[in-house]
Amino acid sequence: MNSKDLIPQPARDDNHSSLRALFRQYLQSEQTPAPLTWESLTTRDGLPHNWIYDIFQDSSSRVWVGTWGGGLACLDSGKWKVFNKNHGLHSNEVTCIREDKLGRIWVATDNGLNIIDDGIVKNGGLAGKSLLNMTFDVHNHLWVGCWRANISGGGLFCYDGSNWTSYTTRQNLPGLEILKVFTDSSGRVWVGTYEQGYGAGVGCFDGQNWVNYTTQQGLVNDCVYSMFEDPSGNMWFGTIGGLSIFDGRSWHTLTRRDGLVNDQVFCMLIDSHKKMWFGTEGGISRFDGEKWISYTRKDGLVENLVRTIIETSDGRLWFGTYPYSPQAGGISIVQYPPEKSLPDRLLDLLPDSPPPKHLPPGK
């Protein structure tokens, strides 16, 4: 797709020229995309479960994998270490992993928050809350989004190191079921909402007030799973109806007719080579500012539904999948741009001991 095909929402200012300038500024088009070699990690390689909800690399280069049903796995020096309820996790359904400035690992689960400090699992608070996403702001305050409002109340929580503050619709939070929490370069906190699949749009908190955006303002769909800020300060939102781009004034939309492989966008990333990657229900789409390239199971992915993306410090991209079948799924890994010896480098990460038996599916 050429950026001139960006489609503005009706009744919004046409800002195509500025978006074209944006893409030229920090994205570089590929004339001939190089073929990619995909590798995979599954329960056969030591993962405790194939349903992957989050992947995170910490400051020590360890890779943490949150699974839905198998707990938390950590890949350190080529060996897997698994944490689950037997080790003190509140739940084996792990939804988000982050690291604080002290090097502690915070783990959001479907039943509360844990902290892993020097290998010891500790209680992190919010017991009984069904947590889905979290982030640290510039002040090292932790923002945690809750969903399943009918079970655990929902809402947004902020921990300043001593006390918790809660935000609900009474404080003008757009909804009670929070799918995504993000802090931008200005320190503002953004949330994406679910609301039983209908969504309530996105909210932006500047420390004092909430400003909310829905389809009435130009968002393509009110159910928002993912977001990022690009190098020019534009906000990108992944919804179940496509992508929305907000430059602070105007809204623009990208959908399947523009080149996305699927309109349900669960995760997104700008890599170190200035390429955009989008994980969807139907595979992965890569955008270089002009052209879309998509990858599915036919190209080597372990599963089409991609729930999370990270780029590790060695330049490899990890895609965590969340299939509808417990026998499918796992992690797909690719070197981009392609480099030689990827299979050898991947094998160096895998544990030498025999992998555990396949675990029974989670809920």
Question: Residue ranges of each PLM-predicted region?
Answer:
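Carboxylate-rich, polar loop motifs that coordinate divalent cations or form catalytic acidic clusters
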Residues: 1-363
